[in-house]
UniProtKB/Swiss-Prot annotation:
Record's protein name: Armadillo repeat-containing protein LFR
Signal peptide interval: none
Pfam families referenced in this protein's UniProt entry, alphabetically: BAF250_C
Gene Ontology annotations of biological process type: anther development; chromatin remodeling; embryo development ending in seed dormancy; leaf development; positive regulation of DNA-templated transcription; regulation of endosperm development; regulation of nuclear division; regulation of transcription by RNA polymerase II
Lineage start: Eukaryota, Viridiplantae, Streptophyta, Embryophyta, Tracheophyta
ARM repeats: 225-267, 321-360, 364-405
Tissue specificity of this protein: Expressed at low levels in coleoptiles, leaf tongues, mature leaves and nodes during the vegetative phase. Highly expressed in reproductive tissues such as young panicles, early developing seeds, embryos and endosperms.
Disordered: annotated segments: 1-32
Complex formation: Interacts with CHR719, SWI3A and SWI3C.
Chief subcellular location: nucleus
Protein's job: Plays critical roles in both embryo and endosperm development. Required for free nuclei division and cellularization in early endosperm development, by preventing premature cell death in the endosperm. Involved in the regulation of pattern formation and organ differentiation during embryogenesis, by regulating genes involved in the early stages of seed development.
Disruption phenotype: Embryonic lethality when homozygous due to defects in endosperm and embryo.
Subcellular location: Nucleus
GO CC, alphabetical: brahma complex; nucleoplasm; nucleus; SWI/SNF complex
Gene behind the chain: LFR
Amino acid sequence: MSHVRSAPAGKSGGGGGSTPAKRGRPFGSTTGSGAAAAAAAAAIGDAAAPAALVGPSLQVLTALSDQNNKRIVLALQSGLKSEILWALNALTVLSFKEKDDLRRDTTPLAKVPGLLDALLQVIDDWRDIAMPKDHTKPPRVRTLGVNTTLSGFGHENVEKVYSDTTTPSDDQTKTADSTVTKKRSAGFLFDEEGLFNVDDEGRTEKQQCAVAASNIIRNFSFMPENETVMVQHRHCLETVFQCLEDQNTEDDELITNMLETLVNLAPVLDLRIFSSSKPSFIKITEKRAVQAIMGMLASSIRVWHCAAAELIGRLIINPDNEPFLLPAIPQIYKRLVDLLSVPAVDAQAAAISALYNVAEVNMDFRLKLASERWAVDRLLKVVKTPHPVPEVCRKASMIVESLVSEPQNRMHLLVHENTFAEILTSEGKYSDTFARILYELTARPSNKVTAGQAIWGNIN
């Protein structure tokens, strides 16, 4: 999977040591090779330079002030390479946030009219422009920069030479309209769907702009003041879910940014927005959104299925989202239990966190989980195996305790009674939990028939 870049432009400019990327910090922002780092260095070195002496590609903003807001939005909407790169680099710096860093100078998206829409247009139009064509799909309509003669992306001059430059008269126009077969303009051969368009460089540059825009949206999603704006912005959520839907034809970096954006917004996200009266741009429904999440959960890429598991765990705690996730519970159950056997500790942690939340709110899930002996065995293995994050083992034991609380599950769980007793005597941290589990199994009135077989003796 490709390394996530924090800006579309910029070369390696330093050989200093790097620190590990943190959650809450853009991936690649600590390597010294991103444009954000270079731009920040330029801002520090030329802080006293007058703004009039530097062009749009050099001027670095230190805050989203009123005089800069409109200029950034217009730059994103221009379709010009120099303007878009300047705006994206500036926003990357402004949206950058260290872990646990309280940004007192942050400006909520709500106070920058049109900024979120401008970023979404860059993503919508250019997110897959450099990917191989799939001729089973209709051509994409791209409007960003369509009226710009020369934008600076790639090699644009070739098609201008071959395009028809003569303006037809009214009579010629009428004749052409009445003709059944029309002769296409030579410029068609060089446009995006044309036969001789080999401007891969321009396509790649545009797609990297979309990746950088997705990174900025991801950064903004870490700021609590932006949560409300983003979860109530239907176009934003539709774009994010459509990117997840098209994971096979998208840039890996862009998918990762969109998925992390959803994970950050999940605690306050209500899927009912897709059936609300808010204007829709892509026609995403609740069912399609859940299917997109399931596609990420089934992915073989570890970062994606871990994030998808975490996303499901956060979404289902909202009672309004539960009806949309219920049809996918069987697939969710199977995939989460499968992740428990993955050697990677982060995959186990994500699966346990999701299992814990789903088991807490859904009784059918608890019944299904307890009825599968191999699934309970994997949970107990997580409890018995030391984990770098003790909270994971604690949640695994609490999942087992929630299973015992269902009377229908006790007969299934009696099979594991010896293992429960072993953990009780050997794992001091979880002895209280497993003491309660054994008590539930052997001392409840519904279990008087099996109490004589319990290892604690007949306690009737």
